[in-house]
Amino acid sequence: ARVALAYYGNSSLYAAWADKRDFREGYDIYGATKQGDQAFGSNVRVQDDFGANYRQWHATIAGHPNGQLIVAWTDERDGSKDVWYSWLEDGEWSDDLALSGASGKGVQDHPSITLDSSGDLHVAWVHRENDGGPTQIRYLYAPLESDDR
């Protein structure tokens, strides 16, 4: 599986990837932090327990100097490929959320994310009306809530 990397905070690096540790289920999203010159820490599962019963892959990550860290991936928990995400808050990963606009009818796959200088989220992904259909690139801008600034 492909590893995605992002710096966040003052000197932290986070790696995220899809990992098939449980041979009975599909891939899950894992991550690990590297602080400064230290080695990567323990692996943690990024997606929540509910997501553990479904396949996830194509992890992407975005970090910000203010400490924000978001991981997004392709997820099949609602019966089709959609973009889901989680963010790091007080050292714990949030419950997973389907990305509004990148879930529902059709196939939403291969997300890519970044945080701009204000901490606003930008997301692009591949959309298909059906599996194997022609592809379209979709984009979503999600401003950070004003109380979070």
What is each stretch, according to the model?
Residues 1-149:
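Extracellular, repeat-based ectodomains that mediate carbohydrate processing or recognition
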